[in-house]
């Protein structure tokens, strides 16, 4: 036997074929959501209030400060919020202090700032009763970026951009004449020296001293028309504010507000970190030759003589001095925008290809502290210096698609940005109120208007592109949705503008973003998934773990470092499958490793790090595909995506051939019930599990409090699947923290179970599995193998109308007793009733307009004292295809104190449950992207059977394998068969699973034939088939695309208002479009009458279609068609363009077009007692 036994949770053992021992546990898979939101509550909110406070009025007399904040307790629990359609939120209270500087009076108050949505334990939000997920956004990090460009003459130039988090952009570029220009905030370009002069370096000499003498600078100075700081300031002002009279003061204040005002220009922590890193002097000194001697200013010791080449070792030696004081210069700008000195660090080196003739200045920004979030003159000088250095081949250009230059905005930051918008709107209101109200009687509460804050938060959760309705089809879909990374959304890319490069897999994605899991279609590459081991650091960069190699001994240690993409670029990383000795020494001399995206073979001394696990490359969903290494990546992509569409079955099975990820995925998804504290199980019911805690008191373990875990039973998920939890522990079990107490949907014994293990044969059968179709045995229908439960919710509300309130009642006009048999005395359907399409769910009547009474009605009214009620039937009925059994009914009444929308007095919700067996037309798939539609369900006796008489369950077409190159399914098939014979479950982790020899070994152990095939007998004749057939156990899942949801038919129904043609689509109960090409087909056959009928009475000849209906009802001949409505619309359109269009008959008389009144349909319909609906488009 190969492989070793591994325990997954309490109930499942698997034989694992993994050879590489895992050094690191998988992190909590939804940590990206929970930790980000926690940061927001702890620090993000505080930062916001500090940024905005104090708010002062225009005179500086009143000052409003935000001191502290606290979140209260939510009003309802998560379950109650879902039931009542409210938001799961807690009240936010802020302590505010108002200081009157004239009188010295101080007022403090607690101000309520609205209800703030809270995150549930599983990383979701409940907004208006629906669970939503905030997807993390991938955006360009604020920083300074340099890129090379080649013009049409083949000349190499450069562009650079300083991108802040918010504020004006600075762009540098060269032109064909080697002049360096700057653009401020996307305006027309200026020579870069104009900006330098405006900063206070007014003369040519100062600029040359700063940047060093070079031809690019002299070209730029020639182009520059200004010669002093004042002129430069005026020049810039004219560019930024054309048409306004320029003054030096205005120009200064404009530049200050654009770049040096923290309220208008913000780099954020991450921008400051990136700029300091990029513009630090050490990066440009590496491997360069010094053109000056470096001396320690304190001791006078020579650190590096002129002409020294600064290799890694020398640079590391002088780095502490570089950080401290070497090359520090203080530039003194005169009369520039910013008063005060500019700290710089400048060192001269020889230009790389000048053989020591030309020296260039390298200016760094002297590492500005992290507190300064705006750009400084030092940054601008250093960024210009870097640009000139690039022209002499010193420094690197940046790759914008590198994950070192893209960062994640998770929930916390997205919320913070939204909250900032609300607060800044509120700030304006506060300022205005300060100047209007009486200063003595004023209070903080009277100043603060919380409306804009609440509105901006509501808007974010309700309508932001990144706030999405949670995909709850199954636990894997839930988990993946929370780990999704989107490049779309506000401040991100748009589908149309995103090019090929942004979407492509990049080497820096390794271990950070999954190269496989992404949608097919227009969003490919823009929506990604976080890799299994990845984490997000404080700056929002994705990090991946690596095992450190000790540089002294060369041994791989157990210590794990998380590296960002740009840190990883400095190291050589070995793969996880390198052979190691007991102590961690590399056994091979030559090692395959990665360095900056290149695969290299190098000696073991050069290795700095090693991968922690083979599956760190892929996401959670992709890691659930066994034998992923044997599948083509296009098919693996489909496999990963289709697992998320698996419908939860009534009795699911976890896969016989799994990957070991099933347990972790299920546990972290939030669908299972997890034990919070260790203890012993005291009671187990369908709806509840009681755990008595163990508490440690003076070294003794004693019984403590009782924890009661509630199960969710038969709840409708967001996608209409059934969400049901069932306990898997027994009374007396000792449970530990983090253990699974109850399975959720699509789980078995604590493991993910999306489908069932079925017996599959690769063979054709009368052509029924042509083009990926699937032939299935009737046993799978009879034994409810692929039966799923679907729950739909229908609601009806009784409102106040102008003519009086609507009423929910059993007394409905023109409805017989038979139709009311399942309604209770209130007029609401009873629980457990079986309903079909069109049945009543809630009886409701709406008052009609009061008409003039006839003599008879007046007489009746006089006798019985009440007018016959003028109401019309507006009851809720079961829509087409919605029949089933009533699972539950919920009634909310305004009188009982339930919160209802304005104008609604009563709300009734009915839940209908359907049990759907698998049928022809349903879509099924394996885990390797092998999908198909069921074409035929055969009786069990007609299915081919094995020599022992067992009929197979499913037949797949063997032609689906070779061209698709997903051989993983064949290996799974054989290994699954062997495992079923042996009665074991298997774990074959991705990239470290069962090899070919392991599979053959297990096949032999199971006593199967040595070609792993078998003879099959035809169930119809009993004859054996000509060739041996591959038969085995494959894990097949039923997908959410079910034929019941797609089948649709209509005779009459709603029509579009303008064209009077039937609406389209199942949701609108529309018709089938008979389009242009279908018309050609009938024309080609010369079927004139059929065609005329289709274009008139079956579509938009309004009078004709009612008459036709009448003729059919009365059994008469169908009348002559009239003029279609769309023809009238066309004529009206032409008339509206000013043309005089008339319709003439054959004998040259004008045909009068009668404008159809809205009532036409209804008048004719009333005569016939037919229902006709007209709907607005």
From Swiss-Prot:
| GO BP annotations, alphabetical order | DNA-templated transcription
Specify one Pfam family: RNA_pol_Rpb2_7
Note the superkingdom of the native organism. Answer: Bacteria
Comp. bias intervals (Basic and acidic residues): 1162-1177
**GO molecular function annotations of the record:** DNA binding; DNA-directed RNA polymerase activity; ribonucleoside binding
From the UniProt entry, list the residue stretches annotated as the region Disordered: 1154-1177
User: Is NADP among this UniProt entry's keywords?
Assistant: no
Task: Return the GO cellular component terms, semicolon-separated.
Answer: DNA-directed RNA polymerase complex
What reactions does this protein catalyze?
RNA(n) + a ribonucleoside 5'-triphosphate = RNA(n+1) + diphosphate
Q: What is its EC number?
A: 2.7.7.6
Specify the enzyme's EC class, one word.
Answer: transferase
The entry's keywords: DNA-directed RNA polymerase, Nucleotidyltransferase, Transcription, Transferase
- Complex and partners: The RNAP catalytic core consists of 2 alpha, 1 beta, 1 beta' and 1 omega subunit. When a sigma factor is associated with the core the holoenzyme is formed, which can initiate transcription.
Described function: DNA-dependent RNA polymerase catalyzes the transcription of DNA into RNA using the four ribonucleoside triphosphates as substrates.
- Which family, according to the similarity comment? Belongs to the RNA polymerase beta chain family.
The record's PANTHER family line, in alphabetical order, gives: DNA-DIRECTED RNA POLYMERASE I SUBUNIT 2 (PTHR20856)
Q: What is this protein called?
A: DNA-directed RNA polymerase subunit beta
The source organism is Bacillus mycoides (strain KBAB4) (Bacillus weihenstephanensis)
């Amino acid at each position: 036997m190969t492989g070793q036994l591994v325990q997954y949770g309490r109930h499942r053992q698997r034989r694992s074929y993994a050879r590489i021992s895992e050094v690191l546990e998988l992190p909590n898979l939804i940590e990206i959501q929970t930790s980000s939101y926690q940061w927001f509550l702890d620090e993000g909110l505080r930062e916001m209030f500090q940024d905005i406070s104090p708010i002062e009025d225009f005179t500086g007399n009143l000052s409003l400060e935000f001191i502290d904040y606290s979140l209260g307790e939510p009003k309802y629990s998560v379950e109650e919020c879902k039931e009542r359609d409210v938001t799961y939120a807690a009240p936010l209270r802020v302590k505010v202090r108002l200081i009157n500087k004239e009188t010295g009076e101080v007022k403090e108050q607690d101000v309520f700032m609205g209800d703030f949505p809270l995150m549930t334990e599983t990383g979701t939000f409940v907004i208006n009763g629906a669970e939503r997920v905030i997807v993390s956004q991938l955006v360009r990090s604020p920083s300074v970026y340099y890129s090379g460009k080649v013009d049409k003459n083949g000349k190499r130039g450069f562009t650079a951009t300083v991108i802040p988090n918010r504020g004006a952009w600075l762009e540098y570029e060269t032109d064909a004449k080697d002049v360096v220009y700057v653009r401020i905030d996307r305006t027309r370009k200026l020579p870069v020296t104009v900006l330098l002069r405006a900063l206070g370096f007014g003369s040519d000499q100062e600029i040359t001293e700063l940047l060093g003498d070079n031809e690019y600078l002299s070209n730029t100075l020639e182009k520059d028309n200004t010669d002093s700081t004042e002129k430069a300031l005026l020049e810039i002002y004219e560019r930024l504010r054309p048409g306004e009279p320029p003054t030096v003061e205005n120009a200064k204040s404009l530049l200050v507000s654009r770049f040096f005002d923290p309220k208008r220009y913000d780099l954020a922590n991450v921008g400051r970190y990136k700029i300091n890193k990029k513009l630090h002097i050490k990066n440009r000194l590496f491997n360069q030759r010094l053109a000056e001697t470096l001396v320690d200013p304190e001791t006078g010791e020579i650190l590096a003589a002129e002409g020294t080449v600064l290799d890694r070792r020398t640079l590391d030696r002088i780095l502490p001095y570089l950080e401290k004081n070497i090359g520090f210069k203080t530039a003194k700008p005169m009369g520039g925008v910013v008063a005060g000195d500019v700290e710089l660090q400048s060192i001269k080196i020889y230009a790389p290809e000048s053989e020591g003739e030309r020296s260039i200045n390298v200016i760094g920004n002297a590492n500005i502290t992290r507190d300064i979030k705006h750009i400084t003159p030092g940054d601008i000088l250093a960024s210009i210096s870097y640009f000139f250095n690039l022209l002499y081949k010193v420094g690197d250009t940046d790759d914008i698609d590198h994950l070192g230059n893209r960062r994640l905005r998770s929930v916390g930051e997205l919320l913070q940005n939204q909250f900032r918008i609300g607060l800044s709107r509120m700030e304006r209101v506060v300022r205005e109120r300060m100047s209007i109200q009486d200063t003595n009687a004023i209070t903080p509460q009277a100043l603060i208007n919380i409306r804009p804050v609440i509105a901006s938060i509501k808007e974010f959760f309700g309508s932001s592109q990144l706030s999405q309705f949670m995909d709850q089809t199954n636990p894997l879909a839930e988990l993946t949705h929370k780990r999704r990374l989107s490049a779309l959304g506000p401040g991100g890319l748009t589908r149309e503008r995103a090019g090929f490069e942004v979407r492509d897999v990049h080497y820096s994605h390794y271990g950070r973003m999954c190269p496989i899991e992404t949608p097919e279609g227009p969003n490919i590459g823009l929506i990604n998934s976080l890799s299994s081991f990845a984490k997000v650091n404080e700056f929002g960069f994705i990090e991946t773990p690596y095992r450190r190699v000790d540089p002294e001994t060369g041994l791989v240690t157990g210590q794990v470092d998380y590296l960002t993409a740009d840190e990883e670029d400095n190291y050589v990383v070995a793969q996880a499958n390198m052979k190691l000795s007991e102590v961690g020494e590399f056994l091979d001399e030559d090692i395959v490793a990665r360095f900056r995206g290149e695969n290299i073979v190098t000696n073991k001394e050069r290795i700095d790090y090693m991968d922690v696990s083979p599956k760190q490359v892929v996401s959670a969903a992709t890691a659930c595909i066994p034998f992923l290494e044997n599948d083509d990546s296009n098919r693996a992509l489909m496999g990963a995506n289709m697992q998320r569409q698996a419908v939860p079955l009534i009795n699911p099975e976890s896969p016989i051939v799994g990957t070991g990820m099933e347990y972790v995925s299920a546990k972290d998804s939030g669908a299972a019930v997890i034990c919070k504290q260790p203890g012993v199980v005291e009671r187990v019911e369908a709806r509840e599990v009681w755990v008595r805690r163990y508490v440690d008191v003076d070294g003794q373990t004693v019984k403590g409090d009782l924890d009661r875990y509630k199960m969710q039973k038969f709840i409708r998920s967001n996608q209409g699947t059934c969400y049901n939890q069932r306990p898997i522990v027994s009374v007396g079990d000792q449970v530990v923290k983090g253990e699974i107490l109850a399975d959720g949907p699509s789980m078995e014994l604590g493991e993910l179970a999306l489908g069932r293990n079925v017996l599959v044969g690769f063979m054709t059968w009368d052509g029924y599995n042509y083009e990926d179709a699937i032939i299935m045995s009737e046993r799978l229908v009879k034994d409810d193998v692929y039966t799923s439960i679907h729950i739909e919710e229908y609601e009806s509300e009784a409102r106040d109308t102008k003519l009086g309130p609507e009423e929910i009642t059993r007394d409905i006009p023109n409805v017989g007793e038979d139709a009311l048999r399942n309604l209770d005395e209130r007029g609401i359907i009873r629980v457990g009733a079986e309903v079909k399409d069109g049945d009543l769910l809630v009886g409701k009547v709406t008052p009609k307009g009061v008409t003039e009474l006839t003599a008879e009605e007046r007489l009746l009214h006089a006798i019985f004292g009440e007018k016959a009620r003028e109401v019309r039937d507006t009851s809720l009925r079961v829509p087409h295809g919605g029949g089933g059994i009533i699972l539950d009914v919920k009634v909310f009444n305004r009188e009982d104190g339930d919160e209802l929308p304005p104008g609604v007095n009563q709300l009734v919700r009915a839940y209908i449950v359907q049990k759907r067996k698998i049928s022809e037309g349903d879509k099924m798939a394996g885990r390797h992207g092998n999908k198909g539609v069921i074409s035929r369900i055969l009786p069990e006796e007609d299915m081919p059977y094995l020599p022992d008489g067992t009929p197979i369950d499913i037949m797949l077409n063997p032609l689906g394998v070779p061209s698709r190159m997903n051989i993983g399914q064949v290996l799974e098939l054989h290994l699954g068969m062997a495992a079923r014979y042996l009665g074991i479950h298997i774990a074959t982790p991705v990239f470290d699973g069962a090899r070919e020899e392991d599979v053959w070994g297990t096949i032999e152990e199971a006593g199967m034939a040595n070609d792993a095939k078998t003879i099959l007998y035809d169930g119809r004749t009993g004859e054996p088939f000509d060739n041996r057939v591959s038969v085995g156990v494959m894990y097949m899942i039923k997908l959410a695309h079910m034929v019941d949801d797609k089948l649709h038919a209509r005779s009459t129904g709603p029509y579009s208002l303008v064209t009077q043609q039937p609406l389209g689509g199942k949701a609108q109960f529309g018709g089938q479009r008979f389009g242009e090409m279908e018309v050609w087909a009938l024309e080609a056959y010369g079927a004139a009458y059929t065609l005329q009928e289709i274009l008139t009475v079956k579509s938009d000849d309004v009078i004709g279609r009612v008459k036709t209906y009448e003729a059919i009802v009365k059994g008469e001949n169908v009348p002559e068609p009239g003029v279609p409505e769309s023809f009238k619309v066309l004529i009206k359109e032409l008339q509206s363009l000013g043309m005089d269009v008339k319709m003439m008959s054959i004998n040259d008389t004008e045909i009068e077009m009668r404008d159809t009144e809205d009532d036409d349909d209804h008048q004719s319909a009333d005569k016939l007692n037919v229902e006709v609906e007209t709907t607005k488009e």
